[in-house]
Amino acid sequence: MELLIHQLLSKEESKKITSNITKDNSCWIDGKTSAGSYAAKVKNNLQLKKDSEVGVTNSNKVNNKLTSDQLIKSFALPRKVHGTMFTRSSVGQGYGMHVDNAYMSSGRSDLSFTIFLSSPNEYQGGELLIQSMQGVKEIKLNCGQIVIYPSTSLHSVKQVSQGERIVCVGWIQSYVANNEDRNFLFGLDAGARGLLAKHGRSDELDLVFQAYSNLLRRLGD
């Protein structure tokens, strides 16, 4: 499972965050300021100042939701959620193909995430394109939904042709850096939890959870 799509925020939570962060246009700056020298050449959007009061308050809200969500914890094994910021793209703006930096001042990027705060009918274009060995996946989600995908992936955002696209993006430093190892662990954990819910505890299931914990010890950093 290369990526996870999940309803993280309710529509009401998403709209409240959007209302909070768009009240003061002076808090928004050129998105190029947070991009690496290569990615900055293809980045064309605005981002909320990370150190602004509204930026800190709302990014903390998002981080708390992320780190308390059981499905995300199982999928991503987050050691640290970092670099969380809000971006907006108006007509003609987007982000060309690029890969995220492996290391940032805030931590290592194992997984990248985008939380869609605008509803799909509020803008045209703005699809997130993620490139993999299987081809390019085009993603445009409902308000409050998150997509988490490997930071090793080339990805881009199509130009917005109508309306405005507002999202929250950030990175996860995982306890398990390798994507394939992390996917194996997620499948094992999901299967074990499913069996526990369906059949209850058993000696055999204890061995499965033991294997999971010991694999995590071996594969983690």
From Swiss-Prot:
Q: Which Gene3D superfamilies match?
A: q2cbj1_9rhob like domain, Rabenosyn, Rab binding domain
Enzyme Commission code(s) on record: 1.14.11.-
Which principal EC class is assigned to this enzyme? oxidoreductase
Per the record, the coiled-coil ranges are none
Q: Where does Fe cation bind?
A: H98, D100, H155
Q: Which InterPro entries match?
A: Oxoglu/Fe-dep_dioxygenase_dom (IPR005123), PKHD_hydroxylase (IPR023550), Pro_4_hyd_alph (IPR006620), Pro_4_hyd_alph_FE2OG_OXY (IPR044862)
Cofactor section: Fe(2+); L-ascorbate
Domain Fe2OG dioxygenase spans what residues? Answer: 80-174
The UniProt keyword set, sorted, is: Dioxygenase, Iron, Metal-binding, Oxidoreductase, Vitamin C
**Which residues are involved in binding 2-oxoglutarate?**
R165
Give the record's cofactor note, including how many are bound.
Binds 1 Fe(2+) ion per subunit.
Q: What is this protein called?
A: PKHD-type hydroxylase P9211_12561
Organism the protein comes from: Prochlorococcus marinus (strain MIT 9211)
